[in-house]
């Protein structure tokens, strides 16, 4: 899987549009990592409507959350957004909205990721304080480090509080 993702990152066709970035790079990484975490499901492009009055409605690219006993999505603790047109600022606005929505559902800690597929940025919202990691990671230069960070986030959100 690692070699396929590496090939996809180096293939210009993977960056034709937002859909190909999601399908050829982001999804395979998330699905590969999630296989190690029974409770953490990858929810792709599902509605996440928490508070319409506060504007906390939408369809984030990916939410990582357990299933409810009825098969629906429980409160997510990790949000991954594809940075449309390489716009990280807009991507973080969308990610932070999903993270705040989770905090309204009593999440004390929520992680966020914004990526172009090649460049990955990481942040967290803890007790209403947002922290953006000042170092972005290049999957082109260090795919293993990208996997390690995503895996670390899955591990953190999979542990009981």
Name each model feature, range by range.
Residues 111-115:
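A short beta-strand->alpha-helix segment at the C-terminal rim
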Residues 1-109, 121-161:
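A short, conserved, highly charged catalytic patch centered on acidic carboxylates
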